[in-house]
A protein has these predicted regions:
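Substrate-recognition/cap helix-loop segment adjacent to the acidic, metal-dependent catalytic center
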Residues: 99-118
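Charged, flexible boundary elements
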Residues: 1-2
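Short, flexible loop segments at boundaries between secondary-structure elements
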Residues: 116-137
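Conserved non-catalytic scaffold segment of RNase H-like nuclease domains
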Residues: 5-95
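Short, glycine/acidic-enriched loop or turn micro-motifs at the edges of active sites
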Residues: 16-18, 99, 150
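Acidic, Mg2+-coordinating catalytic module of metal-dependent nucleases/exonucleases
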Residues: 94-97, 133-168
């Protein structure tokens, strides 16, 4: 009998300067069991789009100890991933937008631990549940940690064909 393993998902979200040349502004990581990581990086205001200036930047600066350099972020995020990872288990880094993965990869300088697997989950995020999460918890969107939390809450695993019951 094969042991059923539940995927260990880490949901990530990022906020960045603009779509043309995205530079990381903040990153949030959330595990379904409740562990969280959040960081904010220095940014150049002139590189930020008008949308980012209006919707993202006003939400920054409220989390104690979140501001750090990119080097510190590399160390702290790597340590956090190692701490939350179940023993000898793969970690699925779940993202709903390609730039989130690209910026995560960039923070790790391309040295993503071999036990971290990327997983695009945009088609598994229930948008109504995501909206409900923000409203119910009175948390604004376009904040990396809030959005990672919302994605974790709204994520629904699609049934796998190997576990489907015929005629059921």
């Amino acid at each position: 009998m094969r042991k059923l393993t539940i995927p260990f998902n880490v949901f990530i979200d990022t906020e960045f300067t603009d779509f043309l040349d995205p530079q990381l502004v903040s990153i949030g990581l959330v595990v379904q069991s409740g562990e969280e990581f959040y960081a904010e990086l220095p940014y150049e205001l002139r590189e930020c789009s008008e949308f980012v200036k209006a919707a993202v930047l006003p939400l920054l600066g409220y989390a104690p100890h979140a501001e750090m350099t990119k080097d510190d972020l590399y160390l702290q995020m790597n340590n956090w991933l190692r701490l939350v990872r179940p023993k000898d288990q793969e970690v699925f880094v779940c993202y709903d937008y390609q730039t989130d993965w690209d910026l995560f990869y960039d923070v790790l300088d391309g040295r993503v631990p071999p036990w971290c697997k990327r997983r695009l989950v945009a088609d598994r995020i229930n948008e109504l549940l995501r909206y409900e999460f923000h409203k119910k918890n009175n948390l604004p969107e376009h904040h990396a940690l809030n959005d990672a939390r919302a994605n974790c809450y709204a994520f629904r695993e699609l049934p796998s064909s190997s576990t489907a019951v015929p005629g059921g």
